[in-house]
Amino acid sequence: MDNMNHEELNDQLLVRREKLHNLREQGIDPFGKRFERTNSTTDLVSLYGEFSKEELEEKEITVSIAGRIMTKRGKGKAGFAHIQDLHGQVQIYVRKDTVGDEEYELFTTADLGDLVGIEGKVFKTNVGELSVKATGFTLLTKSLRPLPDKYHGLKDVEQRYRQRYLDLITSMESRETFVTRSKIIREMRRYLDDNGYLEVETPMMHAIAGGASARPFTTHHNALDMELYMRIAIELHLKRLIVGGLEKVYEIGRVFRNEGVSTRHNPEFTMIELYEAYADYNDIMKLTENMVAHIAKKVLGTTTIQYGDYEINLEPEWTRLHMVDAIKQHSGADFWNPMSVEEARELAKEHNVEIKDTMEVGHIINEFFEQKVEDKLIQPTFIYGHPVEISPLAKKNDEDPRFTDRFELFIVAREHANAFTELNDPIDQKERFEAQLKEREQGNDEAHMMDDDYIEALEYGMPPTGGLGIGIDRLVMLLTNAPSIRDVLLFPAMRHKQD
């Protein structure tokens, strides 16, 4: 369809509708019934690919396969086609004297994109291609629209995202990406289950938007007549479960943030959050690197991966670097000595770091990191020791309370995980929330809201706890070498299509 004008498309649609009418006139259902398959395309290759032409002729192996016609050629009394299923393609050979007049006519009038069922015998052609010689040809579904660009794939990236079903039909690479995504999540679950974690489900609609600094989507509950927020994080409900005695919990689920769309951001995305009682952020660092390495080994067979121009080594142990040391290393600015906000602003001016007038020292430190360091972190690196001002839910560091026991994981200059030793002091937590409310009053609409119910839960006593959040979409991007988050989301957010 990329290279097809409207007139050509309309002609093809009319021809296919006419074929649909003819099928019904012949008593053939163009949207057929159940078809029992014995094999997939990959089964055929793995089971019979090693046999010679002569061995296959001798064995007379009968199979039943189904899929979409992707190529078709031949005239007269015989023809070839390639049939595609989830796993790949296989060639079929159809002869009139084998399948009979009616079924051969079905084959000759079939279009690219039609879904068919084939019964037949496995053989190899003279050039050695594994194929199926049809003894039966069944039309399962008539395709009323032509496939794009003669099955070579969608050239228009926007169309790939809008019509993912066409992308999946025409791009084996795209299908493999989403199969790999499923395997990544399965291995993540398996790793945590094997390590004693309990998978739970918590609400997606919250009375208070909490657990992260982000703008929420709002909705209205008619029966209760109350405003609700689509969750921006899973965190606070999971920590309530830690209070309740569920000592190791995780949830994989959708999170919603009313923010921009980019190659790294989608308004709804998938996260895993996990919490472990009696652990701290050092334990969570070890868990993170071991889990990601495990997933890479199980799904890809290696911990050395290619992402763009970079070869990334995921084998533990990963680099650990304090945020202040990272800033000093990459910019020369030194924030170890306590300083006033005026001194921090002057330092920002000297180093051409853009800041806002309302920022405190901790915010300025974070701006230094984001503007001077982040894009240089290619190999897996744990950046720890975030300022308390930007970490309202993390525990203060015992040795230097300006900073917190928090880390973020960076790979290929992107944040992939956020974790900390959880703040379990309800008095300190209330003070942090109050400081966040002041930020909201100054115009920071991403600052945390007050959550009295969560503070009440902490007052019953939450054990020392380590917590982790990983963006699954970004992890899938990394492990599939995908340049955009849209490449790993089946149906990414899109603007309304212009007529």
Curated annotation (Swiss-Prot):
It is an enzyme of class 6 (ligase). One of its GO terms (biological process) is lysyl-tRNA aminoacylation. Its cofactor is Mg(2+). InterPro entries: Aa-tRNA-synt_II, aa-tRNA-synth_II, aa-tRNA-synth_II/BPL/LPL, Lys-tRNA-ligase_II, Lys-tRNA-ligase_II_bac/euk, Lys-tRNA-ligase_II_N, Lys-tRNA-synth_II_C, NA-bd_OB-fold. It comes from the Bacteria. Mg(2+) 2 binds at E415. Keywords: Aminoacyl-tRNA synthetase, ATP-binding, Cytoplasm, Ligase, Magnesium, Metal-binding, Nucleotide-binding, Protein biosynthesis. CDD domains: LysRS_core, LysRS_N. It is found in: Cytoplasm. Binds 3 Mg(2+) ions per subunit. It catalyses: tRNA(Lys) + L-lysine + ATP = L-lysyl-tRNA(Lys) + AMP + diphosphate. Pfam families: tRNA-synt_2 (PF00152), tRNA_anti-codon (PF01336). Mg(2+) 1 binds at E408, E415. Its EC number is 6.1.1.6. GO terms for cellular component: cytosol. GO terms for molecular function: ATP binding; catalytic activity, acting on a protein; lysine-tRNA ligase activity; magnesium ion binding; transferase activity; tRNA binding. Belongs to the class-II aminoacyl-tRNA synthetase family. Homodimer. HAMAP family: Lys_tRNA_synth_class2. This is Lysine--tRNA ligase. It comes from Bacillus cereus (strain G9842).
